[in-house]
C-alpha cells in the first residue's frame, strides 16, 4: 500500500458543512462504480444505491433524519440492502431461495455487502477531494424512508451518505481511534478484563483531552461516557419489526 492511500485513510473525518455545488453525473457514476468494485459475498451483490438530487425528496428525508446536511450537500446517496432482484430470480427457478435471504445469515450477508460498497464510495470520494458523512439517522423512521424512496419488499434502507466539497470554514479533524493493541488480537481474543479496563481508562483520558482542546474546555467527555450515553438511549427498538415487514430476518 502506498503512503498516499494510507495517509488518505488516516485523514478521514466526517464533514457536515458543504459548499453549494452539486456533483456532476460523471462523478456520481464513478463513485457508484467504485462502490461496485468492492468484494461481495458469493457474488450475490445484495445492494442498491439510491442517488437523491431532488430537493423535495431531500427535504422529506431531512424530516426523518433531523440533520441539515441531508439537504445541504453536493449529492445524497442512500444505501439499500437489496434482495428484491434475487426474489425475482426466485420466481423463475425451482429452488427455494427465500429461506436464505429471509434468514439472519441473509441479513448479515446483505449488510456486510452494503458496508463494503459504501466504504469504497467514501474512499473514492475523499480521493477526489470531497468530504463525506454517513447518515444512520435515516433509520429514525424506516417505514417513512421506504415510502419516500418507493422501496419494494426485500429492500431495506441501511444508511445514507452526504457527499460534497467541504465548506471553506469546515474544521473537522480525525478523532483518535482505540489503540492498535486494544483492537488487534494475535491468534486468540484477549479477554483479560484488567488489561482491557486499563486500556479503556487510558483511552478515556486521551479522548477527554481531545474534546477539551477542540472546544476550549467546553467539552471534556470521555469515550466511556459517550458510549454509555448512546447505548443507554434505547433508540430504534422497532428495527426487527421493520426488517420483518421488508421480508428480512424472519428465520
Swiss-Prot record:
Transmembrane segments: none annotated. Its EC number is 1.6.-.-. The keyword Ion transport does not apply. It holds the Pfam family Nitroreductase. It is an enzyme of class 1 (oxidoreductase). Keywords: Flavoprotein, FMN, NADP, Oxidoreductase. Its cofactor is FMN. NCBIfam families: PRK10765.1 (NF008033). This is NADPH-dependent oxidoreductase. It comes from Staphylococcus haemolyticus (strain JCSC1435).
Amino acid at each position: 500500500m502506498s503512503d498516499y492511500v494510507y495517509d488518505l485513510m488516516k485523514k478521514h473525518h466526517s464533514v457536515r458543512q458543504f459548499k453549494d455545488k452539486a456533483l456532476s453525473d460523471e462523478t456520481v457514476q464513478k463513485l457508484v462504480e467504485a462502490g461496485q468494485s468492492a468484494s461481495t459475498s458469493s457474488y450475490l451483490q445484495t445492494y442498491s444505491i439510491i442517488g437523491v438530487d431532488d430537493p423535495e425528496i431531500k427535504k422529506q428525508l431531512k424530516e426523518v433524519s433531523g440533520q441539515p446536511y441531508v439537504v445541504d450537500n453536493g449529492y445524497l446517496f442512500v444505501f439499500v440492502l437489496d434482495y428484491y432482484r434475487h426474489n425475482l430470480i426466485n420466481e423463475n427457478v425451482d429452488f427455494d431461495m427465500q429461506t436464505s435471504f429471509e434468514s439472519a445469515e441473509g441479513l448479515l450477508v446483505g449488510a456486510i455487502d452494503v458496508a463494503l460498497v459504501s466504504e469504497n464510495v467514501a474512499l473514492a470520494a475523499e480521493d477526489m477531494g470531497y468530504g463525506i458523512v454517513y447518515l444512520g439517522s435515516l433509520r429514525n423512521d424506516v417505514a417513512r424512508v421506504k415510502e419516500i424512496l418507493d422501496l419494494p419488499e426485500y429492500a431495506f434502507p441501511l444508511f445514507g451518505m452526504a457527499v460534497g466539497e467541504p465548506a471553506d470554514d469546515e474544521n473537522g479533524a480525525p478523532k483518535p481511534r482505540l489503540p492498535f493493541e486494544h483492537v488487534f488480537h494475535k491468534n486468540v481474543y484477549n479477554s483479560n478484563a484488567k488489561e482491557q479496563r486499563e486500556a479503556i481508562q487510558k483511552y478515556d483520558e486521551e479522548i477527554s483531552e481531545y474534546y477539551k482542546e477542540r472546544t476550549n474546555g467546553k467539552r471534556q467527555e470521555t469515550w466511556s461516557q459517550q458510549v454509555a450515553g448512546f447505548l443507554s438511549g434505547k433508540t430504534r427498538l422497532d428495527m426487527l419489526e421493520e426488517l420483518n415487514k421488508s421480508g428480512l430476518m424472519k428465520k
